[in-house]
Amino acid sequence: MREWLEAVRGDIESAVPNDAVQERPSGSYAESAPVCHVVAGANGCGKTTFALHFLPRYAACLEFVNPDLIAGGLSPFDPARGAVKAGRLVLERVRELSDARRDFGFETTLSGRGYLTWLGGLKNRGYRIHLYYVWVPGVSILTARIHQRVTAGGHFVPDADVIRRRERSIRLMKEYAALADKLRVFDNSGPAPILVYEKNGDAVIHDAKRFEQVNREVGL
């Protein structure tokens, strides 16, 4: 679990598409295999809001392990104080869920390779990996959202960190996509996320114009 802890330390940081469908795969093996749902994207892209709406309603996943939400519960007026303990609780909860072979989800910026080994280990234990990449073009929308979040009492992420993590996330996305059993890419630059691309065996482009933008950066 060391890879998980290292990744969590690096990651302590709307709406749902109308055409979303149940994410549980079909087939005898797929129906019995537990699923790890990875909600990924840069700081400020809207991962938490997306996950809270999408996972329970459309992926039938009721376990969302989020260190920020845990830290906020431990110390609501100063979540940073609860961050270290939240990291430990995340580790414990993930261990419990994976040992019980239950579906669960978590969010990450994917700005490091730490999850590759850990997710590969889950796959070796029979888990399926579903990756939802929440993409936003450029940095200005991300930083504006983060500053707006701070005024509402949310946590701050320095602009330099946002830029650095976004660049690394985009650079590493293909490696994580290769590990995923199912991939979905959403454009979340507007008021609601738009499904752009998905791959579950066959690749399907749902929005050609947006896919061209995403593909220029990510190289799907």
Task: Describe every region a protein language model picked out.
Residues 38-41:
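The Walker A (P-loop) glycine that initiates the GxxxxGKT/S ATP-binding motif of P-loop NTPases
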Residues 85-136, 169, 184:
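Glycine-rich phosphate-binding loop used to anchor ATP phosphates in small-molecule kinases
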